[in-house]
């Protein structure tokens, strides 16, 4: 399987390139960066699967090109909140090929998300909810894709279990607030925290990344799944790279 990386000159693109070059199961194909030698069309044409580690500002262009020449995609880029156009293009592409959407490819982040949804169903609205994330000073996204995903699963769980609407930055009788905080400092690879806080206690779910290699390894798990399972076209999440159901 020939793998092409979109955003190949960035931090994660460079790391994944090194890891792919050290394996025998995959072939590192031509990658794309804005200052690179290959056009986006040629990168799509000359690879069997694409991994997107670029930026949310490039997603529209990439997905439009893929709709003209569909190839399986691991979409590991932050997806803006309420990005209807991007969502629509991802769903259209998934009609033709497998599309795995995972803004965070680490195993721990996936488990944290599932546990956060569980706790949102357990604790009622006497528990306030806070989501906080910290990344290195060079990260461009004002809010990480992982934090957006955490907010989304918390809102969904509250709606389904308690029939209560939650949102970021809103607090009225009908809509409860989720506090969302982001910091860009130092060289932090990634830290996400979900806290449920009442007048009498709090419980905190915290996931900390010590090495960005965990994201590259998670991407390899998903690539392994694509080879081993030969999945039909469809819209998939990061759970496809896990060996067990969580």
Swiss-Prot record:
Keywords: Amino-acid biosynthesis, Cytoplasm, Diaminopimelate biosynthesis, Lysine biosynthesis, NAD, NADP, Oxidoreductase. NADP(+) binds at residue 34. One of its GO terms (molecular function) is 4-hydroxy-tetrahydrodipicolinate reductase. Its EC number is 1.17.1.8. It catalyses: (S)-2,3,4,5-tetrahydrodipicolinate + NAD(+) + H2O = (2S,4S)-4-hydroxy-2,3,4,5-tetrahydrodipicolinate + NADH + H(+); (S)-2,3,4,5-tetrahydrodipicolinate + NADP(+) + H2O = (2S,4S)-4-hydroxy-2,3,4,5-tetrahydrodipicolinate + NADPH + H(+). NAD(+) binds at residues 7-12, 76-78, 102-105. One of its GO terms (biological process) is lysine biosynthetic process via diaminopimelate. (S)-2,3,4,5-tetrahydrodipicolinate binds at residues 136, 145-146. The active site is at residues 135, 139. Pathway: Amino-acid biosynthesis; L-lysine biosynthesis via DAP pathway; (S)-tetrahydrodipicolinate from L-aspartate: step 4/4. Its main location: cytoplasm. GO terms for cellular component: cytosol. It is found in: Cytoplasm. It is an enzyme of class 1 (oxidoreductase). Catalyzes the conversion of 4-hydroxy-tetrahydrodipicolinate (HTPA) to tetrahydrodipicolinate. Belongs to the DapB family. This is 4-hydroxy-tetrahydrodipicolinate reductase.
């Amino acid at each position: 399987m020939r793998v092409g990386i979109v955003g190949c000159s960035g931090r994660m693109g460079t790391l994944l390139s090194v890891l792919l070059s050290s394996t025998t199961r995959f072939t590192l194909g031509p990658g794309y960066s804005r200052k690179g030698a290959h056009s986006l069309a040629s990168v799509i044409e000359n690879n069997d699967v694409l991994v997107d580690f670029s930026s949310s500002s490039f997603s529209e262009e990439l997905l439009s090109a893929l709709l003209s020449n569909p190839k399986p995609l691991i979409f590991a880029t932050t997806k803006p909140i309420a990005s209807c156009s991007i969502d629509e293009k991802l769903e259209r592409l998934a009609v033709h090929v497998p599309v795995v959407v995972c803004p965070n490819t680490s195993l721990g982040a996936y488990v944290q998300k599932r546990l956060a949804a569980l706790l949102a169903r357990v604790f009622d609205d006497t528990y306030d909810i806070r989501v906080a994330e910290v990344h290195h000073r060079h990260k461009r996204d004002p809010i990480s894709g992982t934090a957006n995903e955490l907010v989304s699963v918390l809102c969904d769980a509250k709606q389904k279990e308690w029939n209560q609407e939650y949102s970021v930055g809103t607090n009225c009788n009908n809509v409860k607030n989720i506090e969302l905080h982001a910091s860009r400092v130092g060289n932090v690879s990634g830290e996400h925290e979900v806290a449920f806080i009442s007048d009498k206690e709090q419980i905190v779910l915290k996931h900390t990344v010590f090495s960005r290699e965990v994201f590259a390894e998670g991407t390899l798990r998903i690539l392994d799944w694509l080879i081993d399972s030969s999945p039909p076209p469809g819209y998939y999440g990061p759970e496809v790279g896990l060996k067990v159901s969580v």
